[in-house]
């Protein structure tokens, strides 16, 4: 295997060359768009766009990332595209425009759109009880109290959780990716996220008490996988079939799916984990239990489990850009109407109370001085948070477990996507804040 620093520097220079061979590109047409950038796009400063791109490549040079691609689209045009580092470490293959990425929780907004397609068709009301479509949940219980000795007191539901609460992570379900409370501990013990199919997941979740009474708190949860089950039960289609028919095909998202076909396998980027012994990033899989919760990383059709609306998709920069542009356009792209603007606005409207706001990573419950809320399958940046950060008020965002991130800012007519394939270093190590750093450079570059 070639020297890692040589590989990374070569890949970084390759990415720089690709970026500089640029022409202004509009996100339009169903063909794979050329993502190379032209900072002469109106509304951005040329030198500051160059600084943004340099800083994104610096993540690789400094060893904070093995590979990265970032995209800034402003006024429907590519203002910046950067790629650096390796897609395939063993063979020294660099990140390319058509590299495929495990987007994990960036699947959640797509599932939210699927839900709202059905909502527009009149299939459900946001205030319908979840049990209307998942009757297995009619007799859920709730954790009332617990202690460190393992004693748990349960209580009945005061009322059924609603679809709106399911889409805003306030229904009370656990997830198992963190938390020492009884609900999350049972999610891990019963390996909920490793369920072979959605019915098995539902059957297991039905045996686990809620973390809190519906509507009383925000907690990141399995709720988007449950949304996927609702989409299947209402539509009579598998989640993958529904996505393909109602979202991917109309938008020209040709590479987004729950598995990677054999003919595309070489385009799937390595995913990296921080090795506890060697103290560096290594391509997975390796024997580290911390990553087992996420299951198969090859995304081969024959080894994939359930179609997870909460974290199961693989995509490309171009595909996810088309999804974001559709959202920014108010629900349509190139004549394909996916949702109404009214519905897009509803999804991007905060539904949390002041006591339920979350931090900008989407991982903490409780209040924050910076108003970051939650809509329907999106985090929402508003008020003081937007004033401090530079985001337009009402910008919405999310990210994925392997460090991918995006945000959509309708006030400034832009979106930004970052594609990385690595799981963060465990504490006490410090991880780069990709989102915050990119945000600072993006808003510094705006001139309009």
Label every PLM stretch briefly.
Residues 395, 402-415:
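Short, surface-exposed beta-strand/loop micro-motifs that present aromatic residues
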Residues 2-12:
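Bacterial N-terminal signal peptides that target proteins for export
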Residues 40-103, 123-125, 142-146, 427, ...:
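Short, conserved catalytic-motif segment at the N-terminal edge
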Residues 22-23:
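C-terminal motif of bacterial Sec signal peptides marking the signal peptidase cleavage site
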Residues 30-40:
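Acidic/histidine-rich, surface-exposed loop or edge segments in extracytoplasmic proteins
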């Amino acid at each position: 295997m070639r020297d890692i620093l040589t590989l990374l520097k070569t890949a970084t220079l390759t990415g720089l060359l690709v970026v500089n061979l640029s022409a202004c590109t509009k996100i339009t047409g169903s063909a794979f768009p050329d993502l190379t950038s032209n900072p002469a796009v109106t509304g951005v400063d040329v030198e500051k766009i160059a600084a943004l791109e340099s800083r994104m490549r610096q993540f690789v040079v400094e060893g904070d990332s093995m590979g990265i691609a970032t995209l800034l689209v402003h006024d429907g045009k590519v203002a910046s595209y950067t790629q650096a580092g390796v897609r395939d470490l063993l063979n020294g293959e660099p990140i390319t425009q058509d590299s495929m990425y495990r987007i994990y929780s960036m699947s959640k907004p797509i599932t939210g759109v699927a839900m709202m397609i059905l909502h527009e068709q009149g299939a459900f009301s946001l205030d319908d009880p979840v049990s209307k479509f998942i009757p297995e949940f009619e007799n859920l219980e709730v954790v009332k109290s617990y202690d460190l000795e393992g004693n748990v007191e349960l209580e009945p539901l005061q009322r059924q959780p609603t679809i709106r609460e399911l889409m805003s992570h306030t229904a009370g379900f656990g997830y198992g990716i963190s938390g020492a409370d009884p609900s999350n501990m049972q999610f891990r013990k019963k390996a909920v996220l490793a369920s072979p199919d959605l019915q098995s997941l539902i059957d297991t979740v039905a045996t686990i008490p809620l973390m809190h009474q519906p509507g009383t708190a925000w907690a990141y949860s399995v709720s988007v996988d449950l949304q996927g089950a609702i989409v299947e039960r209402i539509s009579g289609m598998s989640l993958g079939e529904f996505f393909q028919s109602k979202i991917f095909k109309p938008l020209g998202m040709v590479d987004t799916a729950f598995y990677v076909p054999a003919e595309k396998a070489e385009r799937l980027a390595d995913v990296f984990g921080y090795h506890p012994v060697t103290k560096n990033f290594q391509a997975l899989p390796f024997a580290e239990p911390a990553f087992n919760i996420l299951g198969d990383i090859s995304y081969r059709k024959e080894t994939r489990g359930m179609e997870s609306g909460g974290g199961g998709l693989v995509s490309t920069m171009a595909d996810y850009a088309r999804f974001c542009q559709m959202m920014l356009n108010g629900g349509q792209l190139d004549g394909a109407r996916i949702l109404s603007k009214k519905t897009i606005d509803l999804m991007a409207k905060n539904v949390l109370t002041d006591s339920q706001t979350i931090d900008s990573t989407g991982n903490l419950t409780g209040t924050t001085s910076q108003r970051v809320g939650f809509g329907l399958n999106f985090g929402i940046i508003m008020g003081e948070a937007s004033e401090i950060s530079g985001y337009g008020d009402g910008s919405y965002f999310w990210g994925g477990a392997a460090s991918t991130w995006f945000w959509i800012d309708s006030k400034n007519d832009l979106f930004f996507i970052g594609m990385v394939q690595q799981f963060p270093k465990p504490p006490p190590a410090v991880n780069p804040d990709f989102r915050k750093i990119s945000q600072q450079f993006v808003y510094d570059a705006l001139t309009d």
